[in-house]
């Protein structure tokens, strides 16, 4: 990551991408499961591309689409995590949003295109399972959005004593998944750099902030996923590149910056206020059941909203 230390946003992106490349991609490849070709550092055989049907333009993630078509025909990818390729991370939130929108919507489009075919084809059960989880992984943002709204109703239900407190504690089983996901990111982060107290302290603040910002992108990314699943088409929006290594490039002058303020940005500001209000209610009424969750949501949506206003 050429500009990993440029800002908190770039550090959080590096934190997430290291987990993807070091654990997710490596794990799938070692198990013989389908993985996605990475355009930053990947080499195709021309014969593979042609045999798989060449590039197609019916999804926003044409690399993921071609990867699945090739692997479904029996081609194998060789993943080499020790080989590094320099790449720039989006330094502003509008660029991150456009990239996230393309990735999540394109992933959903590929899920619609390939998931059913993979289930019908003669692949091992493990490959079908991993492929289904991989193709539909962007739906996690819809789950986050629904869970955040449901948490408000559950909080009021417990507060008004119309929902048994035991129901809340039963929902705590979801923490198992949270711990597992957190473990993946911690392992990848500590593996990607020299082990030291500095790296450990870095993980302490990056992990919760990463989860918070990811939650803050749930509204934006859920829209992308729903559009992908329902077949709504949209143009390919290029991720801006700023050449920050030169030290003389203005972020404001980039031609690919988003100038207009989307309605979703205003809704994100409203979500920040909503969950900030839930945090205050929890403190006022001594009902701290969802305080950490609502706190992360309030912080995440507020950061996304403010950063969107500053960098459009």
Task: State where each predicted segment sits.
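Long helical/loop segments within the catalytic core of UDP-sugar-dependent glycosyltransferases
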Residues: 1-60, 72, 93-132, 136
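Generic structural signal for helix capping and beta-alpha/helix-loop junctions
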Residues: 3, 87-88
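Catalytic donor-sugar/metal-binding loop of nucleotide-sugar-dependent glycosyltransferases
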Residues: 58, 67-86
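Conserved glycosyltransferase catalytic-site signature
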Residues: 60-65, 209
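Hydrophobic, membrane-facing alpha-helical anchors
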Residues: 127, 131, 163-164, 243-251
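Membrane-embedded multi-pass helical conduit in multi-pass membrane proteins
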Residues: 137-235, 241, 262-312
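Membrane-helix boundary/interface segments in integral membrane proteins
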Residues: 231-258
């Amino acid at each position: 990551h050429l500009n990993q230390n440029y800002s908190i946003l770039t550090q959080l992106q590096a934190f997430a991408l290291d987990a993807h490349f070091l654990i997710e991609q490596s794990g799938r490849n070692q198990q013989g499961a389908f993985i996605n070709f990475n355009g930053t550092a990947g080499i195709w055989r021309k014969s593979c591309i042609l045999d798989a049907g060449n590039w197609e333009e019916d999804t926003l993630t044409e690399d993921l689409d071609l990867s699945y078509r090739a692997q479904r025909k029996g081609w194998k990818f060789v993943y080499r995590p020790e080989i590094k390729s320099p790449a720039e991370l989006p330094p502003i939130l509008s660029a991150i949003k456009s990239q996230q929108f393309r990735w999540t919507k394109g992933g959903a489009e590929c899920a619609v295109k390939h998931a059913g075919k993979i289930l019908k084809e003669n692949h091992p059960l493990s490959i079908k399972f991993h492929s289904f989880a991989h193709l539909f992984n962007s739906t996690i943002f819809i789950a986050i959005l629904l869970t955040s709204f449901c948490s408000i109703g559950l909080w009021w239900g417990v507060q008004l004593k119309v929902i048994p407190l035991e129901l809340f504690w039963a929902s705590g089983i979801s923490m198992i998944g949270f711990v597992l996901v957190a473990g993946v990111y911690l392992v990848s982060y500590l593996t990607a750099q020299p082990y030291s107290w500095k790296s450990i302290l870095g993980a302490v603040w990056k992990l919760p902030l990463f989860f918070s910002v990811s939650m803050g992108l749930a509204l934006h990314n859920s829209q992308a996923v729903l559009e992908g699943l329902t077949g709504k088409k949209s143009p390919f929006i290029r991720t801006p590149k700023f050449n920050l290594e030169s030290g003389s490039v203005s972020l404001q002058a980039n031609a690919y910056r988003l100038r207009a303020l989307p309605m979703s940005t205003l809704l994100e500001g409203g979500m920040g206020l909503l969950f900030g209000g839930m945090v205050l209610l929890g403190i006022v009424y001594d009902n701290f059941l969802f305080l950490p969750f609502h706190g992360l949501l309030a912080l995440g949506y507020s950061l996304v909203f403010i950063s969107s206003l500053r960098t459009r």
